Amino acid sequence: MELEPAAHVIEGMRATLFHNPTAGHKATKDDILAAMKLADFDVRYISVKDANLEEAFEKKADLLVIAGGDGTIAEVLTRLPDRAMPVALLPLGTANNIARSLGIAGTPQELVETWKIDNTHPLDVGTVKASWGTSRFLEGFGVGVFAEFLKAADKGEKAKGADNLRKGRALLEKQVKGAKPIELSIKIDGKTFNGEFLGVEVMNVPFTGPGLPLATRAHVADGLLDVVCFDAARRRDFEQWLEAPQDAQAPVTARQGKIIELVWADTANRLDDESYGNRDKKQVAEIACEKDKLKVLIPVKHPSQKAVAK
């Protein structure tokens, strides 16, 4: 991952903090504000539960900070009008797929101490054009089993932390076991693939769902999307992989491309962490990355931190 040269955060820098107060359980609003004020930020706090984001974006700031899970991060960044503004992530969710894909992990205090305003990495924004209009995403767009999994997860009681990841993977395994194969037409840069699948995910980052590395070749800023297909014939292999996804590559078929077209019917679709039902009606969607990329701050080690010798 190539980064721009580091520079110190400016004392008194104006930062707009978008916070989801219901995300996570280890860092409160006061914890985050204290960490940022300790680093000499002039902070304007906004709760994503109460705010009009468009109005909030109009306020001048030098840095935009998002504290929350993948849903909050995607909600704010896909609507950000000025992608030249640097953004910083404080991951407070369960999977934290977007932050994880950028190598960002830690408590708010640990992360704030490592921010350098010019140490950024670009992040693609995906776009979907379909009958409902145009939508943007950061993590992925898909149809079939993952979308049905999200619908089922919304109905269940939410656990916290690693326990939630474990329960999420168990629920996905249950969905995979009962998933009805669907006929899909997939076009990648003009080449068509037709088949019977449990689902397909068009991914912008390596991780999705309950912290699963499905698109290990994905690069967050190459303008390419990874098309991950769940072959009906490999259902049992995928069920077994979900029990220990850290031990092996996912048993999926993955291809890359710039312009993806999906044609499907009678199954749900998902956009990041939101799922939408679709029964009977044929849908056609074109998926690609937008030209303008986001600028995300990447943590840098403090000079006093030494690598541990092996």
Residue spans of the language-model regions?
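ATP/NTP phosphate-donor binding region
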Residues: 1-67, 74, 78, 109-113, ...
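Short glycine-/acidic-enriched loop or helix-start segments at secondary-structure transitions
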Residues: 27-28, 75-77, 98-100, 148, ...
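Gly/Ser/Thr-rich active-site loops/lids in small-molecule metabolic enzymes
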Residues: 157-166, 208-236
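Short acidic/glycine-rich loop or secondary-structure boundary segments that cap or lie
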Residues: 146-149, 194-196, 207-211, 235-238
